[in-house]
């Protein structure tokens, strides 16, 4: 199992390096640093790096969460979440291997929220949620209020000898309001298949599983990165492949509860990213 963990960490590093290298050869250009900011995307992307045009943003996210009550308590679960995110412009993560670390923080955001869990049946669970916070660009005066709300769904399609095959969906309404500007709302639908396979081993006292999750994300209106209407930096859809190690019962580190850890590669053609995550967006 520890060999598997080492392979996962190595894969994260290699994918981040490849994604950073791609940012150096992208032909499209972004005229200003503000062009690259989509406050919601940066605050919810996770830990990793994404590129748009010839710019890159490296992100470090600290995702805290704590179960206030579980389904086992009274049939309804409730979880508090807090995502603190640090962003670094034009920092190639492969520089870490040369001993170089970023000398300036570019953006900072805090996004607290709550999530409920309602089991509708043995196979079907829904999770309504709400998040609201703020992002700040430290190199200037740019800032924004950030929010999202929606519902997640997980439906177990089948299981055999510990292997589970589930349909996962989420419907989200979100947006951000830059300082001195109008609110920029949007919404999207995400759907995927979550395949979990038992490993036959334990990890930190929990039976461990391997998860494979291909995801398709559709934005109901074009999701823009460019503040100046640069059509080269707008999304309509994204594809993601996530690979993870997970447990049925979450691991708990005081105020930090998580049930899986993995990597996700995301691409839309114009924007590409790779991230480390501790929970699926479903």
Task: Give residue spans per PLM region.
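Residues on the lipid-exposed face of transmembrane beta-strands in outer-membrane beta-barrel proteins
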Residues: 62-68, 110-118, 134, 149-157, ...
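Outer membrane beta-barrel transmembrane domains
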Residues: 88-102, 203-282
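Transmembrane beta-strands of outer-membrane beta-barrel proteins
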Residues: 78-84, 126-130, 147-149, 163-171, ...
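Detector for outer-membrane/organellar transmembrane beta-barrel domains
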Residues: 142-222
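Transmembrane beta-strands of outer-membrane beta-barrel pores
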Residues: 45-51, 84-92, 118, 132-138, ...
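Short glycine/proline- and aromatic-enriched beta-strand/turn motifs that initiate or cap beta-hairpins
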Residues: 23-96
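Residues that define the transmembrane beta-barrel architecture of outer-membrane proteins
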Residues: 56-64, 76-78, 104-110, 143-149, ...
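Short loop/turn motifs that connect adjacent beta-strands in outer-membrane beta-barrel proteins
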Residues: 67-79, 118-126, 158-165, 199-210, ...
């Amino acid at each position: 199992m520890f060999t598997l963990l080492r392979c996962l960490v190595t894969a994260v590093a290699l994918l981040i390096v490849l994604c950073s290298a791609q940012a150096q050869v992208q032909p499209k250009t972004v005229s200003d640093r503000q062009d690259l900011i989509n406050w919601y995307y940066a605050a919810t992307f996770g830990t990793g790096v994404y590129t748009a045009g010839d710019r890159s943003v490296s992100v470090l996210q600290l995702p805290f969460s704590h179960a206030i009550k579980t389904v086992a308590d009274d049939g309804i679960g409730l979880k508090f979440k807090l995502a603190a995110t640090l962003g670094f412009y034009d920092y190639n993560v492969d520089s870490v291997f040369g001993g170089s670390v970023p000398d300036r923080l570019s953006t900072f955001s805090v996004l607290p929220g709550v999530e409920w869990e309602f089991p509708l049946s043995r196979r079907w669970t829904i999770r309504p949620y709400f998040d609201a916070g703020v992002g700040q660009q430290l190199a200037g005066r740019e800032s924004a209020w950030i929010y999202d709300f929606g519902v997640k769904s997980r439906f177990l399609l089948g299981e055999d000898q510990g292997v589970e095959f589930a349909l996962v969906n989420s419907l989200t309404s979100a947006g951000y309001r830059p300082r001195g500007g109008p609110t920029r709302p949007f919404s999207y639908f995400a759907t995927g298949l979550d395949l979990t396979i038992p490993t036959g081993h334990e990890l930190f006292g929990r039976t461990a599983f391997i998860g494979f999750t291909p995801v398709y994300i559709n934005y109901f209106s074009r999701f823009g990165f460019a503040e100046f209407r640069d059509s080269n930096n707008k999304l309509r859809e994204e594809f993601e492949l996530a690979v993870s190690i997970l447990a049925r019962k979450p691991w708990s580190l005081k105020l930090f509860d998580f049930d899986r850890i993995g990597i996700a590669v995301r691409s839309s053609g114009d924007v590409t990213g790779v991230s480390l995550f501790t929970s699926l967006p479903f």
